[in-house]
Amino acid sequence: MKEQNKNSAAVNELNTVPFKTKALPYCIVAPALIITIGIMIPFAMAIFYSLTNYSFRMPDYSMVWFRNWITILQSATFWKAILVTIKYAFFCIVLEMGLGMGIAILLNNLNNAFSKAMKVALIFPLMIAPVTATIIWQLMLSSSVGIVEKFLNLFGVYGFPWAASPDTAMLTVVMIDVWVNTPFCMLLILAGLQSLPKSPFESAKIDGGSTWFNFRNLTLPMLKPAMYIALLFRLMAALQEYAIVFSLTKGGPGDTLMNLSLTAYQTGFTFQKFGFALPYILVLWFVINKIAKFIVGKQRAAQRLAAGLEE
């Protein structure tokens, strides 16, 4: 009897709770649930259509199961797209991270009016769309009116092929990407530098530590969390690069710059083989997902190490 009274009291107490209080947990969870559903439904549809022969020209389609995947994995086009994607991402990341770190260290050490003016100037490429940046560089590299071409003429170099030659096309798009995205790496690394605690460096100075010793054993380990964040964002973007390459060469000359994104676009929208194009995108997603998990793990480990050094 007492147990029933307790249960009744608990039910009555629950019924007296205001509706807003009861609804609050559901309201908090709802946005995350909606976003998750919004992500999973297109992803599930992509997997499904990759197993079909779906085409925009023919609304009727049938299941081909893994035929698309097998054909693509046996195709030289796929493996060349993989190679182009990796090469492009590698060159971009090495240059952007290296230049971004060098510029960030320079600006952090200057810390004066010149440094502030440089920050404003360096942020400019981030303020324009990649397509706009590509158009600007097309004008700068033009053989007739380009300022870069005029500069090369001073050294006796005329008609440099830039994006017109398979030998220099990769160099050209990487150069534009580096110009556009190095400021992003610089800003993140500079923010990391300016957030470093001063006490470990003061202790090292008292102990007679050299500049190189401090950089290698203090600055770099404590800066790694910020560097991993910059690496993660830039690597994901470089692996799925589309705008700069398409705007400049549309993947040419020939198929020189046909990475996974452009190959998927060409297969799906130019050749109208939508089901055949999706495996390219899903492979790219899988690669980016695995790399992102690896970098996030490294970033967390670096955070723990940095916390230990700060103490």
Label each PLM-derived region with a short phrase.
Residues 1-20:
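Short, Lys/Arg-rich, polar N-terminal cytosolic tail immediately upstream
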Residues 17-311:
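A structural signal for multi-pass alpha-helical bundles of membrane permease subunits
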